[in-house]
From Swiss-Prot:
Chief subcellular location: cytoplasm
Lineage: Bacteria, Bacillati, Cyanobacteriota, Cyanophyceae, Synechococcales
Region called G1, residue ranges: 19-26
Keywords: Cytoplasm, Elongation factor, GTP-binding, Hydrolase, Magnesium, Metal-binding, Nucleotide-binding, Protein biosynthesis
Region annotated G3, chain positions: 81-84
Residue span(s) of domain tr-type G: 10-214
Name the record gives this protein: Elongation factor Tu
Record keyword Oxidoreductase present: no
Binding site for Mg(2+): T26
GO cellular component: cytosol
Length: 409
């Protein structure tokens, strides 16, 4: 059977449901697909189908994630939902499922709970830029004042983590009632059923409030060097996958990391032994570089648009440390611990100087399974930017994953 061609007629965005356990994230995901399926803009997915999320690996870590896709009138969405809390933590830190925005699900009957807070904090630290709130289980709250109180509490909580709590759209509804309405024969048309309308209203807010992300190809050029070789009579070629942006023959680029930054001109772009005029984000290419010796460039450096990225050694990061059962360490570690930090294509040794818990207090040690903020100092400068992901390794095995939250020097 021929594979269906992916028609890219609408702008694309990646979103996901976040929030406390049992507040209705998966039911909402099922309700969105079921309601939109009525308009032919999604494939209806049942709760059980989403809940049985397949395992996947990201940066050496196993995570359970369900991926669904659907469309609204304006956009195409890829939506992720995780069955367990630990899966959210791992997913957001590894960036396995990048989110341009999130739907925070809060039970109107319970209000914000510990994981509500933790997911908002995580969203802030890993750089999920926009949040829309769905107050679920509205059918279980008889008192309109109570609903207003919960809304106020959610807005204050979001503001306390530097999200614009006063401006964030909050839609109240019931995912279960909407699902049951469609199963009971509701059309999915606006105005036919009040519970279905609330799901449609939520998607209108998501469409309007979460901005369309800049396409990778429109961002500044960056390619991590994977391999380097010499072509006799032509010069030095660096190969790798273009992470973002584009590169054309004749353009000036910088070689960043491990040594002093230097400029060079791209004299050729090749892919699969064919020459191209330009390489785009996602392409695996070889770039021929003018005036560069094979010894001047090595794996772990990046090629980038001049001035777009700089080398650093010291940064703050949010890290998830693998449990023993996940293949991680069996024992805790302390400040001064020196593992390898695997960034893009290479391992760099770094020392961990201090740990900070969520409440801002200093932690004395880190136990496998913890999520912690830590300050890292690498022995060699490499191209680092806020929001960049890395793995922490020890003797070649992954013991943790992290994301850069702040560059220090």
């Amino acid at each position: 059977m021929a594979r269906a061609k992916f028609e890219r007629t609408k702008p694309h965005a990646n979103i996901g449901t976040i929030g406390h356990v049992d507040h209705g994230k998966t039911t909402l995901t099922a309700a969105i697909t079921t309601v939109l399926a009525k308009a032919g803009m999604a494939k209806a997915r049942a709760y059980a189908d989403i809940d049985a999320a397949p395992e996947e690996k990201a940066r050496g870590i196993t995570i359970n994630t369900a991926h669904v896709e659907y469309e609204t009138g304006n956009r195409h969405y890829a939506h992720v939902d995780c069955p367990g809390h630990a899966d959210y933590v791992k997913n957001m830190i590894t960036g396995a499922a990048q989110m341009d925005g999130a739907i925070l699900v809060v039970s109107a009957a319970d209000g914000p709970m510990p994981q509500t807070r933790e997911h908002i904090l995580l969203a802030k630290q890993v750089g999920v830029p926009n949040i829309v709130v769905f107050l679920n289980k509205e059918d279980m709250v008889d008192d309109a004042e109570l609903l207003e109180l919960v809304e106020l509490e959610v807005r204050e909580l979001l503001s306390s983590y530097d999200f614009p709590g006063d401006d964030i759209p909050i839609v109240a509804g019931s995912a279960l009632q909407a699902l049951e309405a469609i199963q009971g024969g509701a059309s999915g048309q606006k105005g036919d059923n009040p519970w279905v309308d609330k799901i449609l209203k939520l998607m209108e807010e998501v469409d309007a409030y979460i901005p369309t992300p800049e396409r990778e190809v429109d961002r500044p050029f960056l390619m991590a060097v994977e391999d380097v070789f010499t072509i006799t009579g032509r010069g030095t070629v660096a190969t790798g996958r273009i992470e973002r942006g584009s590169v054309k023959v004749g353009e000036t680029i910088e070689i960043v990391g491990l040594r002093d930054t230097r400029s060079t001109t791209v004299t050729g772009v090749e892919m699969f032994q064919k020459t191209l005029d330009e390489g785009l984000a996602g392409d695996n290419v070889g770039l021929l570089l003018r005036g560069i010796q094979k010894t001047d460039i090595e794996r772990g450096m990046v090629l980038a648009k001049p001035g777009s990225i700089t080398p650093h050694t010291k940064f703050e990061s949010e890290v998830y440390v693998l449990k023993k059962e996940e293949g991680g360490r069996h024992t805790p570690f302390f400040p001064g611990y020196r593992p390898q930090f695997y960034v893009r294509t290479t391992d760099v040794t770094g020392a961990i100087s201090d740990f900070t818990a969520d409440d801002g207090s200093a932690a004395e040690m880190v136990i496998p399974g913890d999520r912690i903020k830590m300050t890292v100092e690498l022995i060699n400068p490499i191209a680092i930017e806020q929001g960049m992901r890395f793995a922490i390794r020890e003797g070649g095995r992954t013991i943790g994953a992290g994301v850069v939250s702040k560059i220090l020097q």
